[in-house]
Amino acid sequence: MKFIKKLILSLAFIAGISLGASSAKAACSTHLGDFDWDSANIHTAIATFIIEKGYGCDVEVTKGSTTPIMAAFFDGQIDVITELWEDNLVELLKPHFADGSIIHMGTNTPASEQAFWVDRATAEAHGLKSVEDMKKPGVWELFKDPENPSKGRMTSCISGWTCYTINYVKLKEYGLDELYTNFDP
């Protein structure tokens, strides 16, 4: 009789824990936005794992490019974005940071920056210290575009990404568009 009483109490306890976990899981859910680049995919996968396994919550993930994911984020359809290139969205983010509707929780990769890059050996060999130096006579030939041999090639971002447009505008503003193509890798 003592054994059966313990067994019933144990089963009741396990059932109670199970029901509690199910209720908590149903009450705890979040929607993550994921972008179309690898580091964002990794950060979102890690966050999903922690939220599901560590907190027992349901997680829905929507993948897409910057424009639709950010539109859904601004509309409140997405709760969390684990990685964002703020430089691409400064003006769109400012009012949301100011009114508190979006909270910046920290920086994933503090050393990351968007810029035009040249390897050190080439830069030192040809005295390239700023973007203005890319206009020096003959410099564009160091980066000759095989598809357009009359220009150099600036490898940009994937067409459709915000940074592609930013780089396109920068090439024009810096006066480099006459010398270089904005190459879509």
Place the predicted regions along the sequence by residue.
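Positively charged n-region of N-terminal signal peptides that target proteins for export
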Residues: 1-6
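Bacterial N-terminal signal peptides
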Residues: 8-18
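Sec/Tat signal peptide C-region and signal peptidase I cleavage site
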Residues: 19-26
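Short, well-ordered beta-strand elements
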Residues: 26-39, 57-62, 150-155
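Short helix-initiation/N-cap motifs at beta->coil->alpha
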Residues: 37-38, 58-72, 180-185
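Pocket-flanking alpha-helical
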Residues: 44, 64-100
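Ligand-binding cleft/hinge of the Venus flytrap
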Residues: 47-55, 133, 138-181
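A conserved helix-loop-strand patch within extracytoplasmic ligand-binding domains
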Residues: 101-154
